[in-house]
């Protein structure tokens, strides 16, 4: 028997186990020796299901271990939850958390382009400023990681029902 949060064929890792952490160390060394200079930490909210404190500790350990090998490495975590919670993950010292408020069909980018929420460029800039204030409380050196869509969401162009210009604008808002 093992715990499989996402799928019965995908066992969860026991991140309290020193042997598992040692394996992480070896795996990161392997990839970094090949030139990899960053890591995406998938499903970080579920390392210890919905236990932000323990999850932040794991990310801090991972961040410290990776940055000891190369201080310029980049680490981003996927923490699909509300902004107040995912902001706390930056306390771990990682560089970024994916900014889920920006993604999806009702996200900040889509709503700004559609003019349906804090419409237009001024509203978008206002939201970006508020997000910066929140995230920098937890890590003043964070790098924002907004995105429009990902592999767990519908494709972005479909949010506009054939509005080609709107699809172009939303992509520009990421830069």
Positions of predicted regions on the chain:
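Active-site rim elements
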Residues: 11-17, 44-47, 155-165
């Amino acid at each position: 028997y093992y715990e499989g949060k996402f799928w019965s064929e995908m066992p969860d890792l026991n991140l309290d186990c020193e042997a598992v952490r040692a394996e992480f160390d070896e795996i990161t060394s392997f990839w970094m020796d090949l030139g990899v200079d960053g890591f995406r930490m998938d499903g970080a909210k579920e390392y210890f299901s919905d236990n932000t404190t323990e999850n932040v500790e794991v990310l801090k350990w991972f961040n410290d271990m990776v940055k000891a090998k190369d201080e310029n490495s980049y680490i981003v975590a996927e923490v699909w939850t509300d902004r107040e919670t995912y902001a706390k993950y930056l306390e771990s010292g990682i560089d970024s958390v994916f900014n889920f408020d920006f993604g999806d069909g009702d996200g900040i980018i889509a709503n700004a382009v559609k003019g349906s929420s804090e419409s237009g460029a001024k509203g978008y800039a206002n939201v970006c400023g508020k997000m910066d204030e929140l995230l920098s409380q937890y890590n003043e050196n964070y790098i924002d990681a907004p995105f429009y869509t990902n592999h767990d969401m519908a494709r972005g162009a479909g949010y506009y029902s054939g509005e080609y210009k709107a699809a172009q604008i939303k992509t520009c808002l990421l830069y």
